[in-house]
Design a protein with these regions (language model features):
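Acidic, mature catalytic/reactive cores of soluble proteins
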Residues: 1-589
Length: 589
């Protein structure tokens, strides 16, 4: 498997990845950022997995059930066949709360004959740090580790527990189930209860997708991407994760491996900007409440990222005992970027606040809190916009005056002005308008490079950067402006490699990037569309989505040479950009 051919299942509490052959290779319980119970994804030998071994006579295919996040893996031979339905339960209960327990259900449905299989159940708790022992009990199989950390995992099944635990051959004469739970169940699961969980979860996802608008072009891609973004939302707090994994490398064998199971203000704000346009306003409201909860008073500084349970310190650690995906070390947990200064987050957040308040001016319970946050951000931007920062790409060395950061400082003030006008709160209006113009003049004077005929990565630099393409999307410049058109063409010429974009080409902390950052190619395609090159944009879009995996899922990066998917998976950035680009191209049609 060389293309991250995994399906994601989840319930907005945690998620799991199932390979195209039905092996559960990544799962963290009880929550997204908990220690793994299966991590074959990060160490083929030590990580642990949950698979079905059926022999070479079977062909295996995998799809999602209808427009849902229930994954179906079908095993077929001439004599027998069966289907595995993998999902994490999620549905609304009678009291209107959501049932989303930390458990994975694997429902086996016999469709022909009497299939034979061996169950390879090999959990490795706590990132496989110590030995995990398996014990057969009366009602369940329990996995236990108590060396470095104490943890347990409970497996319930309608099949012989002894045959499962010892990986003995099993003949399927009827449908069967596995329920793997972080908690010991008070009421034992049965085939009836499993079927009920399946039907309720199926109904939940069909209802969710039914409330998503349909598009004439690329509808299935938009739907799958929207569902993926929903899976990356954490219902308990409203946080939105950058991805479901840690340490999948941007380049095989190199060290750009990061833990993405956190909530970046930038990434999450971009997600809700798009998902709100699809009518899913609950995610937007939950996320903005997450931000409000993080800033309880006016002196609280906004970090670039947080833990999904609002943690503010995300200490980075290295798991030296794991070999890494395709032997790409290190495997990291935590992320040291939480302490960085990135000035672009302010504008991206206030843009989302403005979008929400325009939509729901008279139906937003927290509009006073959002107005307070807006004023606080405007004050911070006014004090600090002239200072350098680490930029959108989180350079770990020196600070610079990044063009994208400056543009988003302008966005912060521009949207603050619009919000003040919306509520007729005009006491700061003149001061903000003066500041808005000062930032804009500064960018136009210092970010434009006459020799390159483009807005460049940072002031005084000749380096080009894909993030500058967003100047138009955020309203800083018109798509018909000759300087923007020239910038788009310069970036296309300088940063494109076989139709895929570099974020930038100048060497960073780890040398020259050797893979394409997927969202950047979407940004470029979007820009081509905006400047009138619609057919070229459509051609490049259809080529790019061809690099997604068998289920239409995308990771953070694509290798320039092999076109294999790299980086954490599935990636919110990639899927939000896919939606935005697909919608814009659909409108252009």
């Amino acid at each position: 498997m060389n293309n991250l051919n995994y399906g994601i299942i989840g319930n907005c509490r945690t998620a799991a990845l199932v390979s195209e052959t039905g092996s559960l290779d990544w799962c963290c319980l009880p929550e997204f950022d908990s220690a793994s119970v299966f991590a074959k994804l990060l160490d083929d030998k030590k990580g642990g997995h949950f698979a079905f071994n059926v022999g070479g006579s079977y062909t295996v295919t995998q799809t999602y059930v209808e427009d849902t996040c229930i994954l179906k893996t079908e095993f077929t031979s001439e004599e027998a066949s069966f289907e595995v339905y993998d999902f994490l339960p999620r549905y609304k209960k009678n009291d209107k709360t959501y049932h989303a327990p930390p458990e994975v259900i694997r429902y086996l449905k016999v469709t022909k004959g009497e299939p034979k299989l061996k169950v390879d159940y090999s959990p490795k708790l706590e990132y496989a740090l110590g030995n995990t022992e398996i014990y057969i009990k009366k009602d369940f199989i329990v996995a236990l580790t108590e060396e470095d950390e104490f943890d347990t995992l409970f497996l319930y099944t309608s099949l012989s527990k002894e045959a499962v635990a010892n990986s003995e051959e099993i003949k399927l004469t009827e449908d069967a189930f596995f329920l793997m739970s972080y908690n010991e169940k008070i009421e034992l699961p049965s085939m009836d209860s499993i079927n009920l969980d399946y039907e309720n979860t199926l109904a939940y996802w069909i209802n969710w997708t039914d409330n998503t608008p349909r598009f004439e072009n690329y509808n299935n891609l938009i739907l799958r991407s929207a569902m993926t973004l929903k899976l990356l939302s954490y219902d308990k707090t409203g946080a939105i994760l950058a991805a479901a994994t840690t340490s999948l490398p941007e380049t095989i064998g190199e060290v750009r491996n990061w833990d993405y199971r956190f909530c970046w203000v930038r990434d999450a704000s971009m997600v809700v900007r798009v998902i709100s346009q699809l009518g899913h306003t609950r995610m937007t409201k939950r996320y903005l409440q997450f931000i409000i909860d993080l800033i309880p008073d006016k002196n609280e500084k906004l970090q670039i990222m947080y833990g999904i349970n609002k943690e503010k310190e995300l200490t980075e650690k290295i798991l030296t005992h794991l070999s890494g995906y395709k032997d790409s070390k290190p495997v990291r947990t935590g992320n040291a970027a939480y302490a960085q200064k990135q000035n672009d987050i302010y504008g991206i957040l206030v843009d989302v606040i403005h979008q929400e308040l325009v939509k729901f001016k008279n139906d937003t319970d927290n509009k006073e809190e959002l107005w307070t946050i807006t004023k606080g951000i405007a004050w911070v931007v006014g004090k600090h916009w002239q200072e350098p920062d680490k930029g959108i790409w989180e350079f770990r060395t020196e600070d610079r005056h990044f063009t994208f950061s400056k543009v988003l400082c302008w966005v912060a003030i521009n949207r603050a002005i619009k919000i003040s006008e919306l509520f007729n709160k005009t006491s700061k209006l003149e001061r903000w308008k003066t500041l808005e113009q000062a930032i804009k003049n500064d960018i136009l004077e210092n970010a434009w490079n006459e020799e390159m005929q483009a807005f460049t990565q940072s002031y005084g630099s000749k380096d080009l950067d894909a993030s500058v393409l967003l100047m138009e999307s955020y309203g800083f410049i018109d798509a018909k402006d000759p300087k923007y058109i020239s910038t788009v063409k310069a970036i296309g010429k300088d940063l494109t490699n076989d139709g895929l974009l570099y974020r930038y080409k100048n060497e960073d902390d780890f040398g020259l990037p050797s893979s394409s950052f997927t969202i950047c190619t979407f940004w470029y395609i979007n820009s081509l569309n905006k400047i009138g090159e619609v057919e070229e944009a459509r051609r490049q879009f259809e080529r790019l989505i061809g690099f997604s995996n068998h289920l239409g899922l995308m990771s953070e990066d694509i290798d320039f040479e092999t076109k294999r998917l790299l980086g954490n998976f599935p990636q919110a950035y990639s899927h939000l950009a896919l939606i935005e680009t697909a919608i814009n191209l659909s409108k252009a049609n």
